[in-house]
């Protein structure tokens, strides 16, 4: 947060200030730092202001003109919010923040199942495209082409059940060809989108969604082997490893 000048307000979701402020060292148990908020206005959007519904997310029209919405997406942390920015009259970018941390946490789904052929992707260990059947048979823990590869671990989120619900809501946006879903730790964005101050309004025209949708499968280990039958419950799932 200190990247931005103190004149930049910090906008947070419901319950954030009570949970995290003051920061450390004033509050030794806080996960935030006092320096993050020093001289800065912290604006918490109350739950009552999320009076719209976009998809299944309670939403707040930030500027009042339909150009940018904050979405109440609790679970990962108290007050976690996502952003939905209009890029053209009919297209949007969904900024998922920490609702997910890897594409395999919310893809594939019944809305967008694994395709027959997954195209080549940057950082891919496959050296080119990959048959969807290989991913289902050799990589996916449940051998299922319509459920995500990963499930969030219990204890990782502030509220595990809420976090899973927020992911379910995000998946519905991800299935829309007019919405580009971006999450904070998605390395597949690098090389597929331009850096600021360039714009991303023409993402659909450039085919960005198609380029990144399955790029995350390039993280999986080609030498993966499924645990023997009957050992799945106790298996070490390091075989579903991600590149660092």
Model feature map: region roles:
Residues 8, 81, 179:
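Residue-level detector of short, conserved catalytic/binding motifs and their immediate flanks
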Residues 90-244:
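Cap/insert and terminal regions of metallo-dependent hydrolase folds
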Residues 46-108:
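Catalytic core of the metallo-beta-lactamase
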Residues 3-72, 120-158, 162-165:
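Metallo-beta-lactamase
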Residues 14, 87, 187:
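Residues that form ligand- and interface-recognition hot spots within folded domains
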Residues 11-14, 20, 72, 80-83, ...:
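Generic marker of "main functional regions" within proteins
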Residues 19, 25-26, 83-86, 108-110, ...:
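Surface-exposed beta-strand edges and their flanking turn/coil or helix-capping segments
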Residues 1, 72-80, 170-174, 184-185:
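Conserved beta-strand->loop/alpha-helix structural units within folded catalytic cores of enzymes
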């Amino acid at each position: 947060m200190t990247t931005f000048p103190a004149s930049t307000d910090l906008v947070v979701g419901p319950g954030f200030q009570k949970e995290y402020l003051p920061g450390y060292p004033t509050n030794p148990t806080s996960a935030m730092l006092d320096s993050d908020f020093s001289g800065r206005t912290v604006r918490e959007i109350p739950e009552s202001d999320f009076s719209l519904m976009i998809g299944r997310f309670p939403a707040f029209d930030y500027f009042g003109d339909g150009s940018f919405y904050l979405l109440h997406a609790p679970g990962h942390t108290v007050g976690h919010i996502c952003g939905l920015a209009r890029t053209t009259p009919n297209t949007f970018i969904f900024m998922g923040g920490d609702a997910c941390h890897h594409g395999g946490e919310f893809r594939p789904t019944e809305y967008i199942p694994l395709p027959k052929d997954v195209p080549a992707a940057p950082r891919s260990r496959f050296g080119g495209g990959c048959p969807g059947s290989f991913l289902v048979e050799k990589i996916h823990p449940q051998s299922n082409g319509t459920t995500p590869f990963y499930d969030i671990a219990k204890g990782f989120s502030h509220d595990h059940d809420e976090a899973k619900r927020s992911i379910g809501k995000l998946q519905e946006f991800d299935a829309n060809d007019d919405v580009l879903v971006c999450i904070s730790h998605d390395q597949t964005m690098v090389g597929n989108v331009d850096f600021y101050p360039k714009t991303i309004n023409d993402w659909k025209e450039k085919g960005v969604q198609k380029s990144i949708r399955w790029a995350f499968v390039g993280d999986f280990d080609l030498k993966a082997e499924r645990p023997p039958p009957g050992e799945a419950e106790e298996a070490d799932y390091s075989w579903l490893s991600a590149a660092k």
